[in-house]
Amino acid sequence: MGIRAQQKEKTRRSLVEAAFSQLSAERSFASLSLREVAREAGIAPTSFYRHFRDVDELGLTMVDESGLMLRQLMRQARQRIAKGGSVIRTSVSTFMEFIGNNPNAFRLLLRERSGTSAAFRAAVAREIQHFIAELADYLELENHMPRAFTEAQAEAMVTIVFSAGAEALDVGVEQRRQLEERLVLQLRMISKGAYYWYRREQEKTAIIPGNVKDE
């Protein structure tokens, strides 16, 4: 990459970080202006268009980055699990660390998931689906269950995790610890329930052939 390309990428990165820094519990992406973001990044407003077509393209890039960042962290968590440790507890701790270190990235995903922009809703839905698919892959590999079961389990887990994450955004350390414990319990219940249901379906299938009558 040449010097010019490096500088362009650096400025683009500054714009993304500037936009993230201006989000808060009180301020959504929709309230940001191009001028504010450009000023925070240290560039002229007109220079913004060298990097993004408009503010919406910047926002969609932020959604993609937020989802990717979370998925990469969860992959790292699964690598830690491979060396020993509780799957669910390690995953929950990693997720809560992500929220603590990147609250605005998670806020963006939460808000735009049900926001007014169809493009943003689709982008967030796509990121969540990636998250579900990766978790389903892992569950299928580890638990040796059919894809239909692991997808249903992964979707239930991600739904509960995102709900807990929304609660965790604006609470204190002790409340977050309690949330973590509750989330670990809920995910274990889903995991046990999925395994029980799978075994039940297997037993039903095994019984059926012996019960078939000659007609």
UniProtKB/Swiss-Prot annotation:
GO terms for cellular component: cytoplasm. PROSITE patterns: HTH_TETR_2. GO terms for molecular function: DNA binding; DNA-binding transcription factor activity. It is found in: Cytoplasm. Signal peptide: none annotated. Residues 10-70 form the HTH tetR-type domain. HAMAP family: HTH_type_FabR. Represses the transcription of fabB, involved in unsaturated fatty acid (UFA) biosynthesis. By controlling UFA production, FabR directly influences the physical properties of the membrane bilayer. This is HTH-type transcriptional repressor FabR. It comes from Shigella boydii serotype 18 (strain CDC 3083-94 / BS512).
